[in-house]
């Protein structure tokens, strides 16, 4: 999902029909931060630098989060949902379901390190539905923008930077191997 994930569903502020409230205690909350607070953390300094350079008041940005929400180029956040198998082969109440939960937990524990430009603000492992699955909500950003804010929301730049890191790693392996 892009910008339409349900953080309230993920954090179980309400229960969907397909969840079992008696098993919600088995869910894991890795983080659950307010998205606006995370936007301030990521972008306030860049926003101040950008606004200081502007000579026209109509070019200044008052609230970067609201600008992204009302714009059409970027989404305020993205959500990925990861699941291994299905309810028939990895049901949450089975040993295989517990294995799936362990794998998803390990994946999440290292997600931020592997993806430094995807700022995770909400992440939950659900064990109260038919199959264990992981919700990760994140804000993609770049710190190397030459136009506009130098630090800004950009999923495209994240993928480009990831490709560059992979290519550099492959080059190191070829030259050292």
Describe the predicted segments one by one.
Residues 1-177:
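N-terminal nicking endonuclease/strand-transfer module with a His-rich metal-binding environment
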